[in-house]
Each structure stands twice: as structure tokens, then as C-alpha cells.
Amino acid sequence: MKIRFLGHSGFEIKMKNHTLVFDPYISPNELASHINLSEVQPDFVLLTHGHGDHIADAEQLSKDNDALCISNYEVINWLGAKGVKGHPLNHGGKKEFAFGTAKYVNAIHTSSFPDGTYAGNPGGFVIWDDEICFYHAGDTALTLDMKLIPLTCPKLDFAILPIGDNFTMGYEDAAIAADYIDCPKIIGCHFNTFAPITIDLEKAKEAFKNRGKELILLEIGDSIEI
């Protein structure tokens, strides 16, 4: 599996014959200006919630690539009114897609569209096929609900967790979250995009190391194989 960091909470993940893109915030992000949106070619676009820094490029990527959007009911309805094809999930629900299974799980955050309208409750995704399982937490606080993931899903090979604090949990809480989800390999997201979420990267790595976990911090545009 190849994972490319698109900046902020955005990732391009290649699973066998399908490409998934999560929370694309590329074109408005000056830190991601070296990424050409036309070269991001998803089969599926997965959106954890409706905030602009998570859905900014969802409409264009979906239409340009005839990609299916997957998110909560309200996000899919909002995008559907713009001509985007989608499939709605809600909390605790899972669905088989061409790439494997997607389960929409709880997150503690807020969610509204850029125009201020209600975007439903935010969530995260657990994704798996017959070879690998991973969790993209979206924007969330540390929550005991995370302990349900090992009880209801296959064992995680890695997880993508927000670590930037202020708007989500910080790296100290994210390291505890790694314990809750029983996952030794964490990819950090939602950090250093804006001033309020600027963190000390070495301290973040140390917080995970102290709990026997690995924190992977990718540069925007960089990839990793798992």
C-alpha cells in the first residue's frame, strides 16, 4: 500500500486497484502548492466532515475523475446538490465497496459547510480489505469511543491521527489514542498548517516513543509504503 501526504488531513492511499483520497485540502493550501490537483486521480473521495479544510477540493476531484464520494448523510446530500455522486454512511455503519470495507466511526468535533449550514456530525473511517486495515480519525478529541475500534474492526496496521492541538487533540492525547486503538504505527496529520496548530515535531515523536509507538511525520507530497 502506498500512502501520499497531500497536506493537513489529506491523504492519497492506493489499495490494490483503487485509489482513495481523504479530506482533500490542496488548492487553498499554500503549503501544498507543489501538488498538481490534476495529478490526484481518486476512484473514491472520503470526507470525514464538512469543514472547508477537509472538503475544499472534493467536488472538483470527484467530478474530474468520476469518483464516488463517501461521507455522512448531510455531506453527501450537500455535494449531491452540486452534481457529485456519493454514498452516505452514518455512525457505526459499514459498507462494502470495490476497494474493501469502509466503516464510519465516531469523532468529537464540530462540522459545518463553508456557507455555514449544518454538515451533520463529524466522524472518521476504518478501512479494510483482505490484506490491511487502517483508521483515519478525521478531526477529533481523545474519546473512549476509540476503544470500540479493536472490538468491532480487524486489527489496525496503521492509523492517521490529528496531533496539532487547539482544534483537535494534541500529540499527548493522540499517543493515548494509539493505545486505545491498539495500533503501534501512527501517521500524524492536522499540524503545522496554521499558526494555532504549530507544534514541536521532536516532542511529538517523543510522546509516542514513550508509549512504545512510532509516529510518522511526512512532508507534504511525500509517500510511504506500508
Could you say what each language-model-derived stretch is?
Residues 12-51, 56-60, 74, 110-116, ...:
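Pre-active-site segment of Zn-dependent metallo-hydrolases
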Residues 114-123, 128-179:
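Active-site-proximal loop/helix segments of hydrolase catalytic cores
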